[in-house]
Amino acid sequence: MKGFKLSCTASNSNRSTPACSPILRKRSRSPTPQNQDGDTMVEKGSDHSSDKSPSTPEQGVQRSCSSQSGRSGGKNSKKSQSWYNVLSPTYKQRNEDFRKLFKQLPDTERLIVDYSCALQRDILLQGRLYLSENWICFYSNIFRWETLLTVRLKDICSMTKEKTARLIPNAIQVCTDSEKHFFTSFGARDRTYMMMFRLWQNALLEKPLCPKELWHFVHQCYGNELGLTSDDEDYVPPDDDFNTMGYCEEIPIEENEVNDSSSKSSIETKPDASPQLPKKSITNSTLTSTGSSEAPVSFDGLPLEEEVMEGDGSLEKELAIDNIIGEKIEIMAPVTSPSLDFNDNEDIPTELSDSSDTHDEGEVQAFYEDLSGRQYVNEVFNFSVDKLYDLLFTNSPFLRDFMEQRRFSDIIFHPWKKEENGNQSRVILYTITLTNPLAPKTATVRETQTMYKASQESECYVIDAEVLTHDVPYHDYFYTINRYTLTRVARNKSRLRVSTELRYRKQPWGFVKTFIEKNFWSGLEDYFRHLETELTKTESTYLAEIHRQSPKEKASKSSAVRRRKRPHAHLRVPHLEEVMSPVTTPTDEDVGHRIKHVAGSTQTRHIPEDTPDGFHLQSVSKLLLVISCVICFSLVLLVVLNMMLFYKLWMLEYTTQTLTAWQGLRLQERLPQSQTEWAQLLESQQKYHDTELQKWREIIKSSVLLLDQMKDSLINLQNGIRSRDYTAESDEKRNRYH
């Protein structure tokens, strides 16, 4: 079942910001990666009910398998799932609750997503916010005090992000002409606001969602397991690369016929090609597994091919010789074009041959765009596109050495199978070594590789890989998609682009999501830097071998591989070397400047300058380290304070016990039963009585002594006062007589 979930997984849209208004929308007419074959299913009551949205065979298998597994579970499975459904209801149950709660809404309204939040009135009413195509609804039930609110999207005049108590950024305010509704306590305020804003703009522009688009958002919010049954006939599975709002156009039949005819003609013109795909299309695309297998933690590896390419060394020498000698001959060739478009772009082909069989008219554009996650590799190598394909996707010495460095083991390759839409896919199982301390030492990986039928030999290869990593933390929450794009730049130059995307089966918590993404992106960055470094070393080795060869061997090789007309001396363009100087081949010094990491989920692009992602990650790591140290210090301080408090309590209890009577004199809880026990009790009581009498005697004796001392002191005081009075009287008498 895991192999079929890719087609129903939502990809991030390039319209995830309010700045991308539907007015500025452009409808893409590029072919989708997955062929549209199969039965059609139309949403009931939709304005696009006449449009037919075909579902892929994989998606049909997914629904049938889920329904069969649901029926075959038996009573035990129903009993075991009942409690889980109560705690985590499926999308179908939520949609039924939505229709029961808001019966006044039209029957055509289908729930798209619901969020837990609170509505601010006299008090905060905790409940759930329901979003449909044309309505915003809220329901709260607090001790049987129900609150229902419905707002038509067309009636909304403003929608803003707000802060609760002017401090906490977790609120959204929706204003109509007469009312204001303040929703707060959102767990993911920005994501909720983006969804509400999209639906609001579509409602204002009167552009309803087509069935594919609606179910795309449902899958994006609820995952793949929707709990649907065969009774839900309005289900329309979205396309694999459905990532834009308003994309409801179908590709014209003429374009499909042209593509089919072109692919057929390419097959017929190549007698060595496979009946399924062009010759290089059926080669096992092995490297696709390597990058994506590093999520969510930093683990390495690369699977190995079973097939062996014979004569690989001679082919490498011939292509490298052809590259060097061909460029020298082309500098002397006449320029047939009236003008040359030279600039600082390093991706411009350097060959100017007038031969029509070399197809060097320019760089080939890939038939599919990069994924919307991050782009890790965007590099031009001095290999032909077929040679680069052989290095990366066959059992070449380069691949074996790289595998040994990445430490892969237990590799199992399943054979390629041709799908009904013309693509080819296979499953690879292998074991990787993990270095993250929070994960096990090893983990098993299941990878499903898909080579699209539009891939052509000597032109372009596009390979996608869906990677499921088991035995790692939260492995059931996410999976990864890697897209490898190999395009021809010149006859012996090709471009390798690798883009990755992290997709979620279930929406994790904020902390869990941060943990997954941190390990995922760091592992991929390390892997792809290593891959590009090894490719650059291999390229330098090939060029060095060419320079060591003799001139005669070079001449013989060049004449056998490539024949060109030598121009006359009077037809040579003057200063052609100076004109060609800006067009240079990639060097080792440029490697560090060509790997650009484009963060974000809206778009993937090539940035000409270095981004401070490494510094930012380092700063974040230092900040986390400081926070961890502060937390540890606080915990140690709390432990010390608790120990001091315990010591004081223990001393207080000990002091209290010393102030009480002897433990042996206390009345026991159990009364004496025998005469001996009574005698012991009386004896102890007598001792206690004697002790108390002795204490009182000592106290009384001490009191008597103190009283005697006090008496003596008072007598002395009295005598002193009398003597002073007598002296004063005698002095007074003397004064009288004199």
Swiss-Prot record:
Main location: endoplasmic reticulum
Domain GRAM: 96-163
Modified residues (Phosphoserine): 28, 30, 274, 550, 581
Modified residues (Phosphothreonine): 584-585, 587
Disruption-associated phenotype: Mice exhibit deficiency in adrenal cholesterol ester storage and steroidogenesis.
Composition bias, Low complexity: 59-70
SMART domains tied to this protein: GRAM (SM00568)
VASt domain boundaries: 372-543
Keyword tags: Cell membrane, Endoplasmic reticulum, Lipid transport, Lipid-binding, Membrane, Phosphoprotein, Transmembrane, Transmembrane helix, Transport
Known role: Cholesterol transporter that mediates non-vesicular transport of cholesterol from the plasma membrane (PM) to the endoplasmic reticulum (ER). Contains unique domains for binding cholesterol and the PM, thereby serving as a molecular bridge for the transfer of cholesterol from the PM to the ER. Plays a crucial role in cholesterol homeostasis in the adrenal gland and has the unique ability to localize to the PM based on the level of membrane cholesterol.
Name listed for the protein in its UniProt record: Protein Aster-B
